[in-house]
A protein has these predicted regions:
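Glycine-rich phosphate-binding segment of PLP-dependent enzymes
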Residues: 46, 89-90, 100-126
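Conserved PLP-enzyme active-site core in the AAT-like
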Residues: 128-344
Length: 349
């Protein structure tokens, strides 16, 4: 297309003012507001102008009716909620990009009902004094998992960062070479340790790490032994992995707390449903783990949250750390998580 032809096309392009005065836009202005229609109109005309300069438009593209039709489509698309219902046809049951686990009906109903009114979050209803926003969910988690105490933050990455910052700042954390994981969004265990002020001390090898490797690596500077669930890969073949019970025995002998980053947070025996390799939260605690942390919106089936459970002393240290306030969730998370945990207590599927 020659410059002369391009110039002829550009002269056919209607001006913004002319389009905005068109009676065809009256309904769009009433539906979407004049400012939004004006913004989208300018953006659309700029797009058409750029295509014309590239020789990629026809005369029909420049007709006023065609432009108004496309403007209407742009406005409808703009007004559609970004977060909206979709069909998960990916083959990934708990898809991060699709909201992970759907909430149970009674959980969703509880959210709708309670969010219409003031909700108790952290006030003692008997004394009127400020209480603990954790207490409702913490009590349910104590009953479900056998933990001495529990606290809730915004997600499991936050839980990991908080416990490292609160319990291991400027000290060593022992992790198997085979568990230095990277999950979505380039979240890497070594990076989160550095951010939390802890010093990584990798033990064993990628494919074989024994209890003795941890025992020999322990020192007076060891703040914790961290067991990380490798949820998105498996090391197979010539391998050896230290069990939770063996690891807890090492921790007990060396007087070093053992923390299990469980990732998904399984509350029931999923092996009966065909999903193997997921540790139970209660089993890890009963095996001797001082703390566990896991997600609320994966296998647990609740809202996005990070749960830290176990030793009351260590949980309290996490609560007292300055990062805790920055990571604590709001009422929607507590309502949804609490109702989800009640479903488990009632033994429902």
């Amino acid at each position: 297309m020659t410059p002369t032809e391009i110039g002829a096309l550009l002269r056919k392009l209607p001006q913004v003012d002319r389009l905005m005065q068109s009676t065809a836009l009256t309904g769009l202005v009433e539906t979407h507001s004049r400012s939004l229609v004006l913004t989208e109109c300018r953006a659309l005309l700029d797009s058409i102008r750029a295509r014309a300069l590239a020789g990629d438009v026809s005369g029909e593209d420049l007709e006023e009716d065609s432009i108004i039709q496309r403007l209407s489509e742009r406005l409808d698309q703009r007004q559609m909620p970004y977060h909206r219902r979709v069909i998960n046809a990916t083959g990934i049951v708990l898809h991060t990009g699709l909201g992970r686990a759907p909430l149970a009906d009674e959980v969703a109903d509880a959210l709708v009902e309670q969010l219409r009114h003031p909700v108790r979050v952290e006030i003692d209803l008997e004394t009127g004094l400020r209480g603990s926003r954790d207490e409702g969910c913490a009590q349910l988690l104590r009953e479900l998992t056998g933990a001495e105490d529990a606290t809730i933050v915004n997600n499991n990455a936050g839980a990991t960062l908080l416990l490292l910052s609160a319990l291991a700042e400027n000290r060593e954390v022992l992790v198997s070479h085979g568990e230095l994981v990277e999950i979505g969004g380039s979240f890497r265990i070594p990076d989160i340790m550095e951010q939390g002020g802890a010093r990584l001390k990798a033990v064993g090898t990628t494919n074989r790490t024994r209890a003795n490797d941890y025992a020999e690596a322990c020192s007076e500077d060891s703040a914790m032994i961290l067991k990380v669930h490798t949820s998105n890969y498996r090391v197979v073949g010539f391998t050896e992995e230290t069990s939770i019970s063996e690891l807890c025995e090492v921790g007990k002998t060396q007087s070093v707390p053992v923390v299990h980053d469980m990732g998904s947070g399984c509350m029931v025996d999923l092996a009966q449903r065909g999903l193997r390799g997921e540790s139970w939260v209660r089993d890890s605690l009963e095996s001797g783990c001082d703390l566990v942390c896991f997600s609320g919106d994966k296998l647990l089936g609740g809202p996005q949250a990070g749960i830290i459970a176990g030793s009351a002393e260590l949980v309290q240290k996490c609560r007292k750390h300055p990062l805790y306030r920055a990571m604590r969730p709001g009422r929607m998370t507590y309502i949804a998580l609490g109702q989800t945990l009640r479903v488990y207590l009632k033994g429902e599927e």
